């Protein structure tokens, strides 16, 4: 886990469901788990306990309708980007489209879906003042935020069969990087290339997600 827990003890809670099928629970180590269909987020907030709780509430409220929003525009999102691409309505869908603009004929906005969900969740949580550091991990596609004087480190490993860290990447608040994503033929999504694993750092998780997909498919 990249962030310290600030000595705040958060007990394990029971899984809580909403009417649309989304579920959430608080995990040990001050982490929030959100899951709905294929979307599975682990969130860490570095800040006072009240700030953490408010940020988690923001994340839960925004997360609940995200999958349904994406499903309503799914046929369009599965279309390769082109200069006459139709307008999209959903905030996450717009992030996905922005991440692949200019990549005519190469990939669809779906290449950025995991990163875009992470970005959206991070940004709504940042509406809560007092957060020092924040990380939203969507199956390895990570959006994060840093305040002045803070940093985070990410571990990178090559093979899931041998999960020893290959290297670590340190990022401080002066860096423009706010997104990390990994792709490859060993991952959970289809990859047409030969790369075992490609990790990309970018200004957003959506950009990192789309870029890693492109490189891994080469």
Predicted regions and their residues:
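A near-ubiquitous, low-amplitude feature marking generic local secondary-structure context
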Residues: 26, 46, 53, 79, ...
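A general secondary-structure signal for short beta-strands and their flanking turns/coil
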Residues: 29, 38-40, 195
């Amino acid at each position: 886990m990249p962030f310290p827990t600030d000595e705040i003890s958060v007990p394990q809670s029971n899984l809580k469901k909403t009417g649309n099928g989304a579920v959430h629970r608080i995990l040990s180590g001050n982490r929030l788990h959100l899951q709905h269909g294929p979307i599975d987020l682990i969130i860490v907030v570095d800040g006072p306990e009240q700030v953490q709780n408010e940020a988690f509430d923001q994340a839960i409220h925004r997360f609940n309708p995200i999958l349904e929003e994406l499903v309503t525009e799914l046929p369009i999102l599965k279309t390769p980007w082109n200069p006459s691409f139709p307008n999209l309505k959903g905030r996450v869908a717009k992030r996905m489209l922005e991440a692949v603009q200019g990549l005519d004929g190469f990939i669809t906005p779906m290449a950025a879906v995991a990163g875009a969900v992470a970005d959206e969740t991070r940004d709504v949580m940042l509406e809560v003042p007092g957060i020092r550091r924040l990380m939203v991990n969507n199956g390895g596609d990570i959006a994060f935020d840093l305040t002045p004087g803070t940093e985070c480190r990410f571990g990178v490993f090559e093979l899931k069969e041998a999960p020893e860290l290959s290297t670590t990447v340190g990022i401080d608040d002066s860096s423009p990087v706010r997104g990390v994503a990994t792709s490859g033929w060993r991952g959970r999504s289809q990859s047409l290339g030969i790369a075992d694993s490609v990790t990309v750092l970018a200004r957003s998780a959506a950009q990192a997600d789309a870029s890693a997909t492109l490189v891994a498919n080469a």
